[in-house]
């Protein structure tokens, strides 16, 4: 028998969130998060912003961007360009939208508003299986803008085939198979808040007919837990679409995905929402990128809050960098305009970093060498890290200091 808290009738749930649409005045996305907390209902904000367990991994995701950026001058750089062409799609930036469930938790217009904002910015929109808006409406809003879909795989192959048929009919270009969320993480904030989804999930209604009023644990139990490489093979074969495997955090899992026919690897730890105590996603990126060795594209998310974070991810092997929570905060505060502004803000920061680092193009960024932070205790000591720092004490005197 289902838990009583999982049986709440959707009609009994009172839910009122933001209906904002317009320009938002904010300095950075950390400020934007504080602003959004005031307009998103407590339970919904807790679901969006919190992480698993003690939130160690959630905070490590941001802290991990500890590599040093060495400025470079005299490089002839002016007005750096973030524009790229990714598998035939011209993008304003390698910054894309990560799949985030239930946009209507943050704004009444939900995925329609976020899709409009992403389209106006000019990048890839990734729809979540747990979207609160159906596929045709999102596709219509996006028009010819690139549209990806994040797939939570059902236990029923017939339902999976039907969803894939719909994806092809709606012009979705790639499938992102999530493999790191076969069960729900220990989200204690949701438990304290008694959070249940106040809105339905039309895309997966065949295997989750009553998404509204359900806990996250219930939602995850409706999906297939025993995912294997055979599922990757089947999705690629049946859909004929590129399949990005979302969740590898080590070389072994990346290799397993490639062996199964993955067209790309999406490095993430689900924003620290699943396994607390795991490594920061940025630390995992470097290992995975080295093992993949540019055989397929790499997408990265988790902890990205600054343009310099995007720069460092690209310099560490990512081809695309995805934003999640910050976009939802922009959606809450300004609808489609707020969504677009978040991308513009971080992209402007990226351009500034590119200028100061002496990189004219995104390809230049990918060849930029980061310097490890020698004071970071999380990086094991190596003779290669044993450097000499030059200290000027007075004119014409240089002293060598070891560290």
UniProtKB/Swiss-Prot annotation:
Broadest EC class assigned to this enzyme: oxidoreductase
CDD domains, alphabetized: LOX_like_FMN
Cofactor(s) listed in the protein's UniProt record: FMN
Record note on cofactor: Binds 1 FMN per subunit.
EC number: 1.1.3.-
Pfam family, one: FMN_dh
Amino-acid positions noted as binding FMN in the UniProt annotation, renumbered to this chain: 99-101, 128, 150, 178, 246, 301-305, 325
UniProt: pyruvate binding residues: 47, 152, 187, 220, 270, 273
Induction (free text): Induced during growth on L-lactate. Repressed by glucose.
Domain of life: Bacteria
Reaction catalyzed: (S)-lactate + O2 = pyruvate + H2O2
Keywords noted in UniProt: Flavoprotein, FMN, Oxidoreductase
Domain FMN hydroxy acid dehydrogenase: 21-375
GO MF entries: FMN binding; lactate 2-monooxygenase activity
Active site location: 270
Subunit note: Homotetramer.
Protein function: Catalyzes the oxidation of (S)-lactate (L-lactate) to pyruvate, with a reduction of O2 to H2O2. Is likely involved in the L-lactate aerobic metabolism of S.iniae that enables the bacterium to utilize L-lactate as an energy source for growth under aerobic conditions in the absence (or at low concentrations) of glucose.
Similarity field: Belongs to the FMN-dependent alpha-hydroxy acid dehydrogenase family.
Protein name: L-lactate oxidase
Gene name per UniProt: lctO
């Amino acid at each position: 028998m289902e838990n009583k808290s999982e049986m709440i009738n959707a009609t009994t749930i009172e839910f009122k969130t933001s209906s904002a649409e317009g320009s938002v005045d904010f300095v950075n996305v950390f400020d934007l998060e504080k602003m959004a907390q005031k307009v998103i209902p407590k339970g919904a904000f807790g679901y969006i912003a919190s992480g698993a367990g003690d939130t160690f991994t959630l905070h490590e995701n941001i802290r991990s961007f500890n590599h040093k950026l060495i400025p470079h001058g005299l490089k002839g750089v002016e007005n750096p360009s973030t524009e790229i062409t990714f598998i035939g799609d011209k993008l304003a930036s390698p910054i894309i939208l990560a799949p985030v469930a239930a946009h209507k938790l943050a704004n009444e217009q939900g995925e329609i508003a976020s899709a409009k904002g992403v389209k106006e910015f000019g990048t890839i929109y990734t729809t979540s299986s747990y979207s609160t808006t159906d596929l045709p409406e999102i596709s219509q809003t996006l028009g010819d803008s690139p549209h990806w879909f994040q797939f939570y795989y059902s236990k029923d192959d017939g339902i999976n085939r039907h969803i894939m048929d719909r994806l092809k009919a709606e012009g979705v270009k790639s499938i992102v198979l999530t493999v790191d969320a076969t069960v729900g993480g220990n989200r204690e904030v949701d438990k304290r808040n008694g959070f249940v989804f106040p809105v339905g999930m039309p895309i997966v209604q065949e295997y989750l007919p009553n998404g509204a009023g359900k806990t996250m644990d219930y939602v995850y139990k409706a999906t297939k837990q025993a995912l294997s490489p055979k599922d990757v093979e089947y999705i690629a074969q049946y859909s004929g679409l590129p399949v990005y495997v979302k969740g590898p955090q080590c070389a072994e899992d990346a290799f397993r995905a490639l062996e199964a026919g993955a067209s790309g690897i999406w490095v993430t730890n689900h924003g620290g929402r699943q396994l607390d105590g795991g490594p920061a996603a940025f630390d995992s990126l470097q290992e995975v990128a080295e093992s993949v060795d540019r055989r397929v594209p790499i997408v990265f998310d988790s902890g990205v809050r600054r343009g310099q974070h995007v720069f460092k991810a690209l310099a560490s092997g990512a081809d695309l960098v995805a934003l999640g929570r910050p976009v939802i905060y922009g959606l809450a505060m300004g609808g489609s305009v707020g969504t677009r502004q978040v991308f513009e803000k971080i992209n402007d920061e990226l351009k500034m970093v590119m200028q100061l680092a002496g990189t004219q193009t995104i390809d230049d960024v990918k060849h930029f060498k980061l310097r490890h932070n020698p004071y970071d205790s999380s990086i094991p000591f190596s003779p290669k890290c044993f450097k000499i720092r030059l200290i000027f004490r007075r004119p014409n005197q240089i002293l060598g200091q070891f560290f």
